[in-house]
Design a protein with these regions (language model features):
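Bacterial Sec-dependent N-terminal signal peptides
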Residues: 1-24
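Structured catalytic-domain cores with a bias toward divalent-metal coordination
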Residues: 20-434
Length: 434
């Protein structure tokens, strides 16, 4: 009797769960905005006719990615950037890369010197050296060719993980303007700029250099030079100071360095918006964990990220878009003492259990945009407001062993303003220049 009762309870529970899933899928089928394809050069026609009000009224758009090495994420983000340029007046493109990338890229996309086959060498992040991203830079260049300078697209880096060459900018400015500065301070700037971060061990050398860099900044601030180059060199010094501070924290108790990096990215975005954007609008290209409006990693972590700072400061003027996927091919970095470390391509053939993707694979659209504000207001069986699993794929790519380490809990309505779901993903095109 007890066995029959347990079977009955299990069947009833299964019936209820299936009913809830059917209700959720029906709501998503009826309310999600279809994205026609992942072609970055085609128009977002359906989205344009159904643009969520919060999206239309926003000024700063954070577009994430569930991994740093997925063709569809890159192409769809490029597609949305072009849409925002054409329809909402966005001209500022900010990337999860270093400040040093700006000069070469901006010269090329504004019609100046450069080579399409080498333009991506300006990036510090290996992941951006793909045909998909170079094609986007080419589109920016073509767009800018017949535009006055004040209406051209400009590229900016917000990250602080590299100090290389910043010292050269500082020395050039000081020599050109004949500013009297202690040579020892300039040598400190040289050392900090040229020294790479060793993430494996603590080095207190970095923290002793910070007050010296601040002193150098004060000496430049006290000069009588206040032109455009002055503003640029102060910005360079701020990046170098931030890099040095970050380097001093990499072996601190978690999550100090993680939060510091995102705080500095927020400060850099804020500076760019306030000083370089004529209409206060900007597009941010980064990982989901940086641009989401709540926190890093699992729900409840309280690790404050870039997107949380942006949402707290800009309120509804900041719009966060996350990405998720179901199946497909993706790269992962393998540490192998025998064969040597290498990248491996994995084929995810079905969505994982207890994930948002498991349910989203049942909808009638291959790619869609979900307005999460609408999901909150109109139901969807509260699917997006319930905690569910999500695959976290960071800089090391897909690492399925052990799987539980990359399965994190999220509540999507708390995490993003909008969600883009892609049923099947593939690898971007690396080594394209050959």
């Amino acid at each position: 009797m007890e066995k029959k009762y347990l079977i009955l309870v299990m069947l009833l529970s299964l019936f209820i769960v299936n009913g809830q899933n059917n209700k959720t899928v029906k709501w998503i089928n009826e309310n999600a905005i279809e994205i026609e394809n992942a072609n970055p050069d085609s128009e977002l026609t359906i989205f344009k006719n159904n643009t969520p009000n919060k999206f239309a009224n926003a000024k700063i758009f954070g577009f994430g990615e569930a991994s740093h090495n997925t063709k569809e994420f890159f192409d769809i983000k490029a597609k949305f950037f072009k849409y925002l340029v054409k329809n909402q007046g966005v001209r500022i493109f900010i990337m999860e890369d270093e400040y040093q990338a700006e000069s070469g890229i901006n010269e090329w996309i504004s019609g100046g010197n450069g080579n399409i086959k080498t333009i991506a060498k300006n990036f510090n992040m290996y992941f951006w050296n793909t045909k998909e991203i170079v094609n986007l830079l080419q589109w920016m260049r073509n767009y800018n060719l017949d535009k006055p300078k004040e209406n051209q697209i400009r590229f900016y880096g917000m990250d602080i993980e590299l100090g290389k060459k910043i010292n050269l900018t500082i020395r050039e400015f000081i020599n050109k303007n004949k500013i009297i500065v202690e040579e020892d301070l300039l040598k400190i700037a040289d050392s900090c700029s040229n020294k790479m971060i060793d993430y494996t061990k603590f080095n207190n050398w970095w923290q002793y250099q910070i007050p010296k860099l601040i002193k150098l900044k004060k000496e430049i601030l006290n000069s009588e030079i206040k032109d455009k180059e002055y503003k640029s060199v102060i910005r360079s010094l701020n990046y170098l100071i931030a890099y040095t501070e970050y380097a001093s924290k990499v072996k601190s108790k978690f999550p100090e360095s993680t939060e510091f990096r995102d705080l500095k990215m927020f400060e850099n975005v804020k500076w760019i918006v306030e000083n370089e954007s004529k209409n206060g609008k900007a597009f941010i290209w980064a990982h989901n964990e940086h641009i989401n409006k709540k926190e890093m990693w699992s729900t409840g972590s309280s690790i404050i990220n870039l997107g949380r700072h942006l949402k707290d400061y800009y309120k509804d003027e900041y719009y966060s878009v996350g990405f998720d996927f179901g199946i497909g091919k993706i790269n992962g970095f393998v540490v192998d003492k025998k064969k040597g470390n290498h990248w491996k391509t994995y084929d995810i053939i079905k969505p994982f259990k207890k994930t948002y993707a498991k349910t989203l694979m049942s909808i009638n659209k291959d790619i869609c945009f979900v307005d999460l504000q609408k999901a909150i207001e109109n139901g969807s069986s509260n699917f997006f407001s319930k905690k569910n699993k999500h695959i976290l794929i960071g800089a090391g790519g897909y690492k399925p062993k052990p799987l539980h380490k990359i399965m994190i809990s999220k509540i999507y309505t708390e995490t993003y303003d909008g969600l883009i779901f892609v049923k099947e993903i593939s690898k971007p095109e690396y080594n394209w220049e050959k």
